[in-house]
Amino acid sequence: MTSPSSRTPRGSTPPFEPSADELVLHASGRKTAEDRLPGDPSPAALIDRFLRVDQAGEHGAVRIYQGQLAVLGRRSANVGVLRHMLAQEEVHLATFDKLVADRRARPTLLGPLWHVAGFALGAGTALLGEKAAMACTTAIEEAIDGHYKDQYDRLGDDELPLKATIDTFRREELEHRDIGYANGARQAPAFPVLSGAIKAGAKLAIWVSERV
């Protein structure tokens, strides 16, 4: 049975906005891409790339949890945590949808692919069992952790709202990782192989979505 939470219409979730106090915490005295080398993207091009890939990634994450809930539905002992993680990912996606529109960034051309692939990954791992679904979560979130950390480190004080947003979302992704491990991810069948394959796929999707 499909969870009602898995059918939340895109665009109905309010985006996240960091508070003034949060902005102060992330000041570094640096500017975005101030140490870039010849041939590196300009600050504007870098932000365009960041927003494109982050929107794509959060779209994929929403679809993964929707796929897992479509398979596991109400019979899963983890349905509550799946809904919690989905709700947070929906806020992440709503935020990047707004940022892409406000800053006129170019969305990835591969959105339809990630829409299908994310759901398929979520449903496929759920069909392998609840622990495999949690292994999917830990693998994805570990890939996203490194991705968001790299973005955070490259943003300066001229992009404090985006920097604070990425830090907040990164901490929530790490929470999802910890939830996955606490709910048996390591006990999934062939965990090292499954986790490694999903991480590799996530990193490839990040690389492609930045560029296409």
UniProtKB/Swiss-Prot annotation:
Predominant subcellular localization, coarse grouping? membrane
Q: Which domain of life is it from?
A: Bacteria
Q: Which CDD domains match?
A: DMQH (cd01042)
Q: Which UniProt keywords apply?
A: Cell membrane, Iron, Membrane, Metal-binding, Monooxygenase, Oxidoreductase, Ubiquinone biosynthesis
> Pathway listed for it?
Cofactor biosynthesis; ubiquinone biosynthesis
| Reactions catalysed according to its record | a 5-methoxy-2-methyl-3-(all-trans-polyprenyl)benzene-1,4-diol + AH2 + O2 = a 3-demethylubiquinol + A + H2O
Q: How does it sit in the membrane?
A: Peripheral membrane protein
* Signal peptide location: none
Annotated binding of Fe cation 2, by residue: 89, 141, 173, 176
Q: Could you tell me which InterPro entries the record lists for this protein? A: Ferritin-like_SF (IPR009078), Ubq_synth_Coq7 (IPR011566)
A GO BP entry is:
ubiquinone biosynthetic process
In the record's cofactor note, how is the cofactor described as bound?
Binds 2 iron ions per subunit.
Disordered, as annotated region: 1-22
Name the Enzyme Commission number(s) assigned to this protein.
1.14.99.60
Q: Where does Fe cation 1 bind?
A: 58, 89, 92, 173
| Any GO MF annotation of the entry | metal ion binding
Q: Where in the cell is it found?
A: Cell membrane
Q: What does this protein do?
A: Catalyzes the hydroxylation of 2-nonaprenyl-3-methyl-6-methoxy-1,4-benzoquinol during ubiquinone biosynthesis.
Q: Which family does it belong to?
A: Belongs to the COQ7 family.
What is the protein name for this chain? Answer: 3-demethoxyubiquinol 3-hydroxylase
Q: Which organism is it from?
A: Rhodospirillum rubrum (strain ATCC 11170 / ATH 1.1.1 / DSM 467 / LMG 4362 / NCIMB 8255 / S1)
Write the gene name. Answer: coq7
